[in-house]
Structures are given as structure tokens and as C-alpha cells.
Regions:
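Extended hydrophobic leader/signal-anchor segments used for secretion and membrane insertion
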Residues: 1-201
Length: 201
């Protein structure tokens, strides 16, 4: 085998027929490279779709954090090993209409009392510091979040269809956690999920 390889290489260098015989091999390599690239692209496509979903923001209920028309990447595995935390921005199946997906911020966790009074949101009577909202809420109310459910609000408090209207979000309805704004390109950024901060801290 070594002798044959040496002969082919020598013939190629000398411009013998072996040089022409090398062309099909080059084409095979090109085709093989293309096939490998296509296979890798398909694997990556299905792999990414298995762990994430891409959604379009439709409306203004999450301004100023998210803008109408932006596209975001949602991590579907975020809550397989844990549960949503206060401040997380989540995409979920609307409990009232299973054909509709919504995106809101988690405010109340199971067992907590959520109160909205005088433009402030409070958890167990302790006000939250919310620098991300568009304006203080104009509505008032008190809610106690049941086990296995969440209380979610839009950052644009007075223009949002959320838990202050239709009550609680079952955890099983959560699709995933919003992690990245990827379109349009000038708005590309990792979504910053506000840590739990109480007013006065």
C-alpha cells in the first residue's frame, strides 16, 4: 500500500495521468464537506429547537423592557431543574386561551400575598423596588398565590393583560424563560432578570 501511494504521488508531480485521477477525489472531498456542513446545520437546528423557542413580542405590555416587534429567544429547559423566581420574564400559555402565548414578569410566588396599593406592589406587605416598570399601577388589589401557581404582571402595568385581571398562572403553563433579544440587530442583548429587591434595601 505504501508503494502504491508513493507511485501516485510521484506520477502527480510528474504530470502523469495520476494528476487527473486526483480530481474526482477533490470533488468527493468538496461534496463530503458540504454534506457534513448540512448535517451539522440540521443537528444544530433541531438541537436548538429542542431546548429553546423563538417568539415575537406582540404589543406593549412589557415596555420598556421589551418592545413591540422584537424577537426573543426562550430557554425551555430553564425550569426543568428548578422553579421560576421573582423577577423572571417568562413565556407561557395563556390560561384563558390555550391558543395564545403571553410574556410577563413573575411577581408573586406560591403562598405569597401580593398587594397593589397607592402605586406600589408589595409582597407580604413589603414593597418591591421596581425600576423596570413604565409607570406606577393605577389599580389596587390583594391576592394570595395558590400552591403550584404564579402571579405575573407586565412591566407596562396599566396596559397589560395579566394576573391582576385573570388571576393566577399555573406553573405547568410556563413555556420557558426569556433570555435574549436577537432581533432587530441593534437591540441585540441578553435579557437582564431583575434580582429580588425590596424597597429600602
Amino acid at each position: 500500500m505504501e508503494t502504491t501511494q508513493h507511485e501516485v504521488e510521484t506520477q502527480s508531480e510528474q504530470g502523469q495521468p495520476g494528476a487527473e485521477a486526483e480530481k474526482p477525489t477533490d470533488w468527493k472531498r468538496v461534496v463530503l464537506d458540504i454534506l457534513e456542513t448540512l448535517v451539522l446545520a440540521v443537528v444544530l437546528y433541531f438541537g436548538i429547537n429542542a431546548i429553546s423557542v423563538r417568539v415575537r413580542v406582540d404589543g406593549y405590555s412589557m415596555t420598556p423592557t421589551l418592545q413591540n416587534g422584537e424577537y426573543i429567544l426562550v430557554n425551555k429547559l430553564a425550569y426543568k431543574m428548578g422553579e421560576p423566581q421573582r423577577g423572571d420574564i417568562v413565556v407561557f400559555v395563556f390560561p384563558i386561551d390555550p391558543h395564545e402565548d403571553l410574556i410577563k414578569r413573575v411577581i408573586g410566588l406560591p403562598g405569597e400575598k401580593v398587594s397593589v396599593h397607592d402605586g406600589k406592589v408589595m409582597i407580604n406587605d413589603v414593597p418591591l423596588d421596581e425600576p423596570y416598570i413604565a409607570a406606577a399601577p393605577l389599580y389596587n388589589g390583594d391576592w394570595v398565590v395558590p400552591d403550584g401557581q404564579l402571579f405575573v404582571l407586565g412591566d407596562n402595568r396599566n396596559e397589560s393583560k395579566d394576573s391582576h385581571q385573570w388571576l393566577y398562572l399555573p406553573m405547568e403553563n410556563v413555556v420557558g424563560k426569556a433570555v435574549l433579544i436577537y432581533w432587530p440587530p441593534p437591540e441585540w442583548q441578553v435579557i437582564n432578570h431583575t434580582k429580588e429587591v425590596y424597597a429600602g434595601q
